[in-house]
């Protein structure tokens, strides 16, 4: 790998409602990424847990701060033990803040953390666009029942890979967000996700390649995959749920990938593998600059008409 190339790892996993088990998988994937000489590893949305319903999510979110602290400690341990630095981008949940509760808002926060090799959280981006949809011949989902939307566009991160713009899952459907991140200097965009089978099959690759071409950025797409076990006997007992009320399974699309600024897929998860998986790609900043120089979209934009 030459000096102009930076290696990225994109992880795919199948989260459950058990944060302890999920953390074990996350740590194993980070360890593998270090051993394969990645500079940054990107994990999917909801790497801490997936839940049965809004009440279950609020219950599990109380455990997320401990998950995050243990993850930070694990990163520093892995860096020390392997004598190699790595940064980590990971989608997790946070419980409502004290101010949220004072305002009568008990919904959780869906956030993307960027943690450096010293275990420091450099950025906490809260998902802007929430997945409230009635998919034709598919599920009816209303993320806003359990999640509060963010209120701010995240700053660009000066990562070992280059200038990184952060987004989460459904954000990818709003091109103005990606274009804004590009206008702020982004060279790389990440979209950690938990796409449904129906929407993933129809739009996952299409959206990723479109955002890469729109922005002339590398696009990183770590996804949840497979059938998730959302059973939680402890919570079900506490909440006195009947068997009919339980919703202990959901399925995610997977197909994690890395796309270059020309819209070419340069790394793709093995679709036959449902378990945890890591894909690698070497990002070439000279290629990015060449594409931007030969097709100077940002110089040709009609900012006098479009704002």
From Swiss-Prot:
<keyword id="KW-0496">Mitochondrion</keyword>
<dbReference type="GO" id="GO:0110050">
    <property type="term" value="F:deaminated glutathione amidase activity"/>
</dbReference>
<feature type="binding site">
    <location>
        <position position="199"/>
    </location>
    <ligand>
        <name>substrate</name>
    </ligand>
</feature>
<dbReference type="InterPro" id="IPR001110">
    <property type="entry name" value="UPF0012_CS"/>
</dbReference>
<dbReference type="InterPro" id="IPR045254">
    <property type="entry name" value="Nit1/2_C-N_Hydrolase"/>
</dbReference>
<protein>
    <recommendedName>
        <fullName>Deaminated glutathione amidase</fullName>
        <ecNumber>3.5.1.128</ecNumber>
    </recommendedName>
</protein>
<keyword id="KW-0963">Cytoplasm</keyword>
<feature type="active site" description="Proton acceptor">
    <location>
        <position position="45"/>
    </location>
</feature>
<dbReference type="GO" id="GO:0043605">
    <property type="term" value="P:amide catabolic process"/>
</dbReference>
<feature type="active site" description="Proton donor">
    <location>
        <position position="127"/>
    </location>
</feature>
<keyword id="KW-0378">Hydrolase</keyword>
<comment type="function">
    <text>Catalyzes the hydrolysis of the amide bond in N-(4-oxoglutarate)-L-cysteinylglycine (deaminated glutathione), a metabolite repair reaction to dispose of the harmful deaminated glutathione. Possesses amidase activity toward deaminated ophthalmate in vitro.</text>
</comment>
<feature type="active site" description="Nucleophile">
    <location>
        <position position="169"/>
    </location>
</feature>
<comment type="similarity">
    <text>Belongs to the carbon-nitrogen hydrolase superfamily. NIT1/NIT2 family.</text>
</comment>
<dbReference type="InterPro" id="IPR036526">
    <property type="entry name" value="C-N_Hydrolase_sf"/>
</dbReference>
<feature type="binding site">
    <location>
        <position position="173"/>
    </location>
    <ligand>
        <name>substrate</name>
    </ligand>
</feature>
<dbReference type="InterPro" id="IPR003010">
    <property type="entry name" value="C-N_Hydrolase"/>
</dbReference>
<dbReference type="Pfam" id="PF00795">
    <property type="entry name" value="CN_hydrolase"/>
</dbReference>
<feature type="domain" description="CN hydrolase">
    <location>
        <begin position="6"/>
        <end position="285"/>
    </location>
</feature>
<dbReference type="GO" id="GO:0050406">
    <property type="term" value="F:[acetyl-CoA carboxylase]-phosphatase activity"/>
</dbReference>
<comment type="subunit">
    <text>Homodimer.</text>
</comment>
<dbReference type="GO" id="GO:0005739">
    <property type="term" value="C:mitochondrion"/>
</dbReference>
